[in-house]
Amino acid sequence: RKLLRNIAISWIMADILNMANKAVFFDRDGTLNVDVHYLYRPEDFQWTPEAVEAIEYCHQQGYLVVVITNQSGVARGYYTEAEVQRLHQWMNEELARQGAKPIDAFYYCPHHPQGKVAAYAKECSCRKPQPGMLLQACQEMNIEPARSYMVGDSPRDVEAGEKAGVKGVLYTGGSLLACVRENID
């Protein structure tokens, strides 16, 4: 009996030590912010209704918050990766100004098959609906897909999530907080 108890304790400890995180992955344009096509400047940024509250709610429920976004404007030559990164930094600064916790990570795909910038003009596994960004985030951040969600305004967002083993949630406008509360455990 003592041996069985020790084995059970070992299994429990292994589970505790290997516990994976859960996450809510958000698409950016059209989900967290109003889609203005090829957004890269903070002065053009506008949160969707109750997006800040949705981010904060996810944190309160114990989820990591991760942005997963296609940024084909890089491949098209409209803006640079540095400008994408500056906007993401600004988003977290804006969250802090509003008293909210920051987004835990940003993953973006700069590629597009018809891009004008040769280095980015290609097919890839990261551009949604492919699951590459989600799979990379799960690996790098120790996220368990089965306990996680992908929230986006496009069927390709939901498809990318499902291909990665993540539950997809289609955001159709209105309060992002209401969408999250209705669909996320």
What are these regions (language model features)?
Residues 3-4, 17:
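Leucine-biased recognition of intrinsically disordered, low-complexity hydrophobic segments
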Residues 35-36, 67-72, 152:
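Short beta-strands and strand-loop turn motifs
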Residues 37-46, 80-82, 120-124:
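Short glycine-enriched, charge-decorated loop/helix-capping segments at active-site entrances
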Residues 51, 55-91, 102-112, 161:
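Substrate-recognition element of Asp-dependent hydrolases with the DxDx(T/V) motif
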Residues 27-29, 70, 153, 157:
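Acidic active-site catalytic centers that drive phospho-/nucleotidyl reactions
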Residues 16-22, 82-104, 113-150, 154-185:
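Asp-based, Mg2+/Mn2+-dependent phosphohydrolase catalytic module
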Residues 16-66:
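Active-site neighborhood of HAD-like aspartate-dependent phosphohydrolases
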